Amino acid sequence: MPPPQRFRVQSKNYFLTYPRCTIPKEEALSQLQKIHTTTNKKFIKVCEERHDNGEPHLHALIQFEGKFICTNKRLFDLVSTTRSAHFHPNIQGAKSSSDVKEYIDKDGVTIEWGQFQVDGRSARGGQQSANDSYAKALNADSIESALTILKEEQPKDYVLQNHNIRSNLERIFFKVPEPWVPPFPLSSFVNIPVVMQDWVDDYFGRGSAARPERPISIIVEGDSRTGKTMWARALGPHNYLSGHLDFNSRVYSNSVEYNVIDDISPNYLKLKHWKELIGAQKDWQSNCKYGKPVQIKGGIPSIVLCNPGEGSSYKDFLNKEENRALHNWTIHNAIFVTLTAPLYQSTAQDCQT
């Protein structure tokens, strides 16, 4: 008689199935992590499932740094911590870790450790169908999930076309941002200078059809914590541009009533879109650095908010001799207000600007 065949599995990816196993997935993961192996483990995923008859079982995927040779069929046995019981798995070498991961992700609840190691093989005999992979990505619930699918199933595209893939998914998964909800009602701002209130009444007191073709903007200068930002943002639907200009569709909308330009230095705005934004110009294009050209509908005023002092004050900036022409243009397209006191009385707003 031939000698009995010795148990031997050699693979980078191990697929384990524990029938009728009552050990919780967290405990199973902990025990698998502690098993000594001559090759380092890179990733472990455990899935806890129940058959239709209620019988529990576990699946586990273990990925190693390199091929691991297992000659001990009891190596991956799990031990119950609540009773005297051992659970022995069916041990298989997996040709495609991606297929095993997809299989155990379908049902049950999972827990994992480490970083999944992507492979380029499929148990179906060839590359994963690109159409299947991209269809699955489109059905994902987030950009991150879609990218993970493509990383695991189409690694070549993921590496060579990553920028285009990410850009396309951002457009596909784009969701209109939730409207900003002001923390304080407009009625709490009780110290509004007359010139500011007149500007508000003149613009917001009319229907959109009755507003001028190019409304006048307003430049408000005041110390920090005077409430100017909260006041400006409480007036209605708006774009909030702070620190720099970003016309990405994720943060900038062509369907709002006005722009709030907050803490953007006058020198920066001069180099970018001073006349377009303060002058409420229509149908212009932004070519800001690091982004594709964006068409801006425009035709809405801007509330420019700034602090006093060199580099911040729009008044001081425009009073410089080299900005005389821009000064003359701006006084015909915006009104200036200097705050001498907070716009509110409540101490609750004292931490807001």
From Swiss-Prot:
Any Pfam family: Gemini_AL1
Gene Ontology MF term list: ATP binding; DNA binding; endodeoxyribonuclease activity, producing 5'-phosphomonoesters; helicase activity; metal ion binding; nucleotidyltransferase activity; structural molecule activity
Motif extent (RCR-2): 57-59
GO biological process: DNA replication
Protein keywords: ATP-binding, Covalent protein-DNA linkage, DNA replication, DNA-binding, Endonuclease, Helicase, Host nucleus, Host-virus interaction, Hydrolase, Metal-binding, Multifunctional enzyme, Nuclease, Nucleotide-binding, Nucleotidyltransferase, Transferase
Positions annotated to bind ATP: 222-229
Protein name (Swiss-Prot/TrEMBL): Replication-associated protein
Native species: Bean golden yellow mosaic virus (isolate Puerto Rico-Japan)
